Structure formats: C-alpha cells, structure tokens
Amino acid sequence: MFYTKLKNTYDNKNRLTERTAKEKKTGKETVHTYRYNAYGDVAVQDDTQFVYGDVSGQVTKETTKLTKNKDVVKNYTYDSKGNKSTFSVKAGEDTKLSLSYEYDGSSRLISVKDSEGNQAVSYAYDTEGSLSERQAANGLKTTYGYDYQNRLTSMTNETGKGVVSKYSSTYLKNGQKAEEVSTVMDKNGKSTKKTAAYTYDMLGRITRETKTGREDISYTYDANNNRKQMTIGNKTTAYQYNKNDELLRTDTLHTDTEKNDVVIYKNDKNGNQLATVNRSEIPAEAKDTSYIDVDVTLGDNQLNDNVVNHYNALNQLTETLTKNYKVSFTYDAEGLRTGKTVNGEKTVYVWDGDQVVMELSKGGAVQKRYISGNDLVYADKGENTEKTYYVTDMHGNVVQLLDESGNVTKTYEYDSFGNEVKPEKKDENPYRYCGEYYDKETEEVYLRARYYESSVGRFITRDTYTGESDEPLSLHLYTYCENDGVNAWDPSGHYKIKMKHINGMKWKKNWKGRKWTKKNISMMNALLKKYGIKKKKSIALMMATCDQESGQGRIMQEEGDDNYCRSHGYTVYTKGAGYIQITGNDQLDFLSYIGVKPKTNRTEQISKKYAWEAACWEWGICQKGGHSMNKYVSDHGKSISVFLITQYYINGWPYSKGDKKYEQFNSDMISLRKKTKKFSYNRKKIVV
C-alpha cells in the first residue's frame, strides 16, 4: 500500500533531534522529537519530560501530558546500588499508585509494598540465584524446583486452603520440554490432572502436541520455515504464502463434513497484514477461489467476519476494523503503546520500564492498576478496591485468577502457540498467554514491537530485527519463537527468549568461556589502541569492569522481564548492551561514533556485533575526560555496579582472605593485577 521514507535530524553534537517517517504514497508523516539537557541526557521526548538524579544519572521524574490541564507524573527513587526503591504515579494532583521495593545483597528483589506498607509480594532465592519461593498478599505461595542444569522442573501454587495448581516437567537432552504433568483446580473446586507431551523435528520446531482431554495437534513446515499444515482432530488447515513469506490464504478442511473454510489475507508493500476475509463453508472441491477479493475500504456494514488494519509510516498498527469494533492505537517514541480507543472509549497506558502499571481514562480516572514485582502479582481498580491475583504455569502463562481469599475465580488453558482452549467473550482480563496483554477486540497479543496472531502462529508485520546468520530460523521475519512456543517466549516482538533463564537475563556464549585466539587477540589489541586504553591500570580496570558488569563475561545484553532492568528505567530497546552495559543515549552516541545506522533494537544490535568495541569506547570516554580512576569510581561506581571491584584494584580488596567473595574475584582476575605491560587472561596474552 505504501513504502516508507525515514529521515533523522541531528544537532551540532550529532545527537538525534527528530525522526520522521513518511509514507511515500500518501505523504502522511510520523514524527518524534528529542531535546537534551546539559549532560547529554534526553530531557524532552515528544510530550514527555525527564529529570535525572545528580549522582546516578537515573530518571527520577517523568512527566507526560494527559490533557491540556493535567499531566501524568512518575517519580522514582533509588538505593545506593542503583536499584529502584520507590515508584509513584500521579494523574493531575492525585496519587494513583505508590510502591516501595526491597532487595537482598545481590540486588535481587525480595519485597514489594504498597503505600500503606502492606506487602504485595515477596521473593526468595536459592544458592544458585534462582527463584525458589514467591509469596503474594492473599496467601498464594509458589515454590520452584530445579534440576542440576538449573532447569525448572517443578512448580506448586498453593493457598491456605491447599494446592490450586502444580506442574512438573521433563526435558530432552537438547533442553526442550518433553512432557509436562499439571494438576489445576477450577472455580468449582475440582482439580484435574493432565499430561502434555511434545515432539520436535531436527530444527527444534514443534511437530506434535498431545494433552489429556484434548485433540492431538500436529504441524508441518515448508522449506522457508513457514507453517505448511496444521491438523487438529478432523480439521486440517493448509497455509499459502508468497515469496516474501507473507501469508496469503488458509484452507481448513473438515473431513467429517467436506466443508472448506477459506481465509484470504491482503498485505501492503511493507509486508503489513492489511485485511483478512473469511469465506466459510466453501465446498472442498472448489479449488478456484480467485474470485474472492479483499476490499480494504470496507465500511462498517460490510465487514461481517472480516478484519481491516491500518498502519502509520513506522508500520505500527494504528487502527483495526471488525464487525463489532473500531479500535485505534497510539505509541510513544520508544514504540510502546500509549493508548487504545475502542468504539470511542479511550484507555491510556502508563508504563514502568516495559510493563504496564496502570490504565487510565482519557480524563485521568483509574480503570485498572497492575502491581508487579518480578512478575505480575495482582490487578485492582484503585485504592481499597477488590484485587484479582494472577497464577501462572511454568511457561509464564496466566492459568488462574484468584480473589483476595485465595479462591479460584477463572481458569485458562492454551495450546503451544497461545490459542485458548475455551475462550469466554465476556472475559475482561487482558493478561493471558505468556503473561502478556491480549486484545480481545482484535484477538491478538500485544508484544511491544509487534502484534502476535496466535491462530496462525505468526506476527502480523515484518520484524525490523533481521536475525542472525548463524541462527537460520531467526532470519524469518514473521514466525513466532522460531515455531517453538513451548520452550520460548517473545516479550519484545523481535526475538525469542529460551525458557532456560536466570533472573530474566539472556545468557550467551561469553568471552570468558571462549578461547582467546590470535584473531580475537589482534582484534582486542586494535580496539585498545584505537580508544587510547594503554595504561596497565586502565586495561586491568576496564577488563574488571567488563567482568563485573556482564556477570563474568556471560551477559552481553539485559532483556526479558528482569526486575533490575525495569527498576532502572531501561526500555525494551535501550537496556544494557555490550560487556560494559551501555544504555539509552550512550548507545546512539556510540553507533554514531563508529558510523553505523541505529536499528530499532539498539541493545541487540550492539550486543551482537559491537560488544567489545562498545566497552572500549565507553572506557575510552572516561580516559579522554581526564578522570582519574578514583574520581571515576566516585562519580560512577555505584551506578555501573563496579564499586567493589574497582576498589579492589585501586585501594585493595576490602574483604579478608578466605571470604567467599574475595576468593571468587581473586581467582578469576589475579592476572589483571600484575604490574606488567601485558594483559594476561585465560592463559593467553593481550599485548599493548
């Protein structure tokens, strides 16, 4: 329907000041503007203003225009380690939400309390750092069990009245789930035990799922990784695509009635799904359905069971028309959805990081509040209103709703790709599959960057992240979780996160575990020289910082639903990237410095290709600014989480020998302390 032309405007310091996307055919523009403070932080982004802390550089106040005379104001405070300690939301003069947070010595969240000091949820962790117990205010207690590979193998949800649901899983050698046994109580107090089993092909795509009480489901795929066929009982659905992997048509054959349900899809030139037209009960022998046309200008009276979508120049869904609904959407400069209007009734979304914390009317009245810790705990409609508590399974799917007394009020069940087994049209709860926001009007799951249509197991728009050449399945621009919805989820709308995770962080191959070769030693030396990191203490301290910031080199990017990322105000696209976790505008500055065009997901872009160079660039800035190492630690140590490790190199390790922390870091980095002109690590040499 249209192609998009993008234009970025920069100031004399090479900072982005305006981003304009223009539809070539219609001329319509989507514009986002940016202004900066004296320290180079974004001070104004569209209609949102930011205030930062003097020491930490973290956002302490965020103000967004709601109406002409009313603002939404979010306030943050942080502890000495940079963890979010309080968070509040005001709409106009009224405080709508106020929460406080507590952490253990490793900055793991252990408690969330409301404005009156009542504990909403608490968390406990095992010796490996994995979540072992979760306790909600209504008495809901969740316990977690793991195997020797730290895979989640058991999970029990119980209240004072007994177990409401429990799960256990076994895994294949490659880590994919083989079987899950569940026992779930319904609202009538009846518990049902079911067993689900999963089969995969050699590429890791799910090919078959069976579950007690349900018809078996099987899947096949074509050479381009598109779903080719799905069979459920006596129904077989075949899928057709064009050369760009855009879905064109589905044919669902009912073998018992010989009827063929046809759905035709229309796509624009940017690969966005414009419309779907349902033509039910076409005889199976009627192979020629070319006469079925898709009119994207259909009026309300012509829609019937059809759907029409409209997009802006950034390929964001802005409007959906169905038989019963007219739905429109708005977004901020980070791509997060700020509003949804259904048949004239507008809902405003208030975010904390990448999680919705509140829904407001257009005038600022509270419609819903969502209280979260490491995960979603409960929803209510304001202070002193009834709370609805969320219960999840091992995949993070919402499987039960409980009242304040711990009684089950609603249950959910899904297939591997998020289709509800028995959906209820009057259900007002939006959080369902993977604990993500489901739009019942469009029957799609909102995953921040894109919308997911579970009925076909695909996104309705192309991915702006094009994947990795060494991971062929990631190159597909439409599939959900590389056709494996059992062992992964996709909260960003860009890439899957495997179920094996630690505190929401994505673990990758790491520099500590990777052997130093002549090639990468040469690369490292070149980067050290390029960014002027030549002093032995500078090299030692930079490598120590990389070691500490990235969990001894294991983490190249922060993502997922990790509370640490949310508490620091990092959006889905600007969380820490590289071995020194650079964030936000630092990412733009770095990419501008090396002459690389920023992608939508800068965190992924930097982590995949520039992890080491970003670290050297960040450290080089410290040196070029004339900072002594002690001053750098004083100014930034707490905010970058390297205070103790930098003290180790500058003033000596504060702990005594024999202390577990001393031994851990000393054994890993003893070579960094050597007063030589060579940097030694993993028995290899990096020479300056």
Q: Can you annotate each of these PLM segments?
A:
Residues 54, 100-101, 105, 233, ...:
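A motif-centric feature for acidic-aromatic and gly/ser/thr-rich catalytic loops and repeats
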Residues 420-424, 487-488, 548-562, 625, ...:
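Secretory-pathway/luminal and periplasmic proteins that interact with or process carbohydrate-rich
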Residues 337, 401, 419-421, 453-460, ...:
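Short, low-complexity export/processing leader segments characterized by acidic and small residues
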